[in-house]
Amino acid sequence: MRAAFDFDGRHALVTGAARGIGLAIARELHAGGARVALADLDGDAAAAAAATLGVHALGLTLDVRRVDHFEAARDRLVAAWGRIDIVVNNAGWAPLTPVAAITAAEFDDVVAVNMRSVFSSCQVFGPVLQAQGHGRMVNVTSLAGQNGGTVAAPHYAAAKAGAIMLTKYFAQLLAPHGVTVNAIAPGPTATAKGRLSPEQVSAIEARVPIGRFAEAEEMAAAVALLASDRGGFFVGATLDLNGGLYVR
């Protein structure tokens, strides 16, 4: 795999990296020369995914709802690598629960996974990157956080909107210290097709001006741009990756 950007000598953490968009991001960074930690709630799957990348990749068990897991990951990676250069907050959860059936517990869990985790990660890793005088943080949000969602449930859309605002906040806080914080907002992506009926897939494709779902690798390419040296002037940006479904 030929990488679009050079990450030689960089050290990256990607959450939700056992599969899907997260794994594609990890592959892109690794192909560019980065050492990559693939973190996931399913630690065994993260380790298996890391093994497919070969050397300079490792798997971690990380529950993004728990700040102590972020702290443990920070301590382990700093001890192993001496530094962390790139943090990609990709982990997410998008249940398709009908509004009337959403419980308070599910609502809180969705917010914890999709929004509070971004805060926890920035709170834990921000000072590390700041002390180094250089770093990149990229948050994977969603089109649902921009337009309220259609297929997505309301708690997911609200949490992703919050993640976009946290991106803006931490971008302004950390930019003076050489650390950029940005986001991508994926629209319909092929990794989600398995959760949809053929009729839903066709209906979504008909609404997307480009006429198709995105590939996970297209999301990874955008993250790589934001994480690269060439992406150093992006600060607090959210890149719209939706095939024209939402234009602003």
Stretches found by the model and what they are:
Residues 98-99, 103-111, 204:
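Substrate-binding pocket helix/loop in short-chain dehydrogenase/reductase
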Residues 122, 159, 167:
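Active-site helix of classical SDR
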Residues 127, 172-173, 232:
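Alpha-helical segment proximal to the catalytic Tyr-Lys
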Residues 142:
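Residue(s) in the substrate-gating loop at a strand-loop-helix junction
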Residues 175, 180, 234-236, 242:
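Short, small/polar-rich loop/turn modules that mediate ligand/substrate recognition or access, typified
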Residues 208-219, 230:
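A conserved structural motif in NAD(P)-dependent oxidoreductases
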